[in-house]
């Protein structure tokens, strides 16, 4: 049985680099066996339906196809609706009452290497803060996203994994879109 998934692509359509038109990106997912593919904004958010046999291999398949078709090396992070619900529910900064416009989440491809989180410097970019929770890093940027030293490359090198960041507004909107799909009845013969 198929389930709703979210793919988060890192580093596409940011300025002049790694341009991928959203219809072309949706086509890549459809050709990989995904159904009901929908993109959200231009930064590489793709919501789709897939059976488990496809979703397990999907990050690698999509990354290879993007490299082949567009010439871009783009990491792909995958989450289910349940995982996204947990991301929203467990945001420690939101629980502290932080304003939504300074909250972000970094989604990691894998769990950090054991003990790797201890190598992170909590004072690297004050007053900005972070908390590592499983395959997510919750980010609080009161000084602004553009000026932080808490970058994807910093976390990638320290944790031994790859991540991509989304604003809290985008995270909650993506979950809303995923939940809407789960509430909408589908015809059995729908393609």
Model regions and ranges:
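Surface-exposed, charge/polar-rich loops and edge strands
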Residues: 2-183
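Short, low-complexity, charge-dense intrinsically disordered segments
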Residues: 184-191
């Amino acid at each position: 049985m198929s389930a709703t998934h979210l793919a988060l692509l890192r580093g596409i359509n940011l300025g002049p680099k790694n341009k991928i038109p959203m219809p072309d990106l949706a086509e890549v997912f459809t050709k990989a066996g995904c159904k009901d593919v929908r993109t959200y904004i231009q930064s590489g958010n793709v919501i789709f339906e897939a059976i488990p046999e496809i979703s397990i291999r999907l990050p690698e398949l999509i990354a290879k196809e993007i490299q082949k078709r567009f010439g871009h090396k783009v990491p792909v992070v995958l989450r289910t609706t349940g995982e996204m619900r947990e991301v929203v529910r467990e945001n420690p900064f939101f629980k502290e009452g932080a304003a939504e416009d300074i909250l972000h989440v970094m989604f990691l491809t894998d769990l950090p290497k054991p003990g790797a989180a201890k190598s992170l410097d909590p004072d690297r970019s004050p007053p900005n803060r972070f908390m590592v929770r499983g395959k997510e890093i919750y980010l609080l940027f009161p000084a602004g996203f553009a000026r932080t030293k808490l970058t994807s490359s910093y976390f990638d090198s320290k944790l031994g994994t790859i991540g991509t960041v989304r604003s809290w507004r985008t995270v909650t909107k993506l979950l809303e879109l995923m939940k809407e799909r789960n509430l909408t009845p589908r015809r059995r013969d729908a393609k």
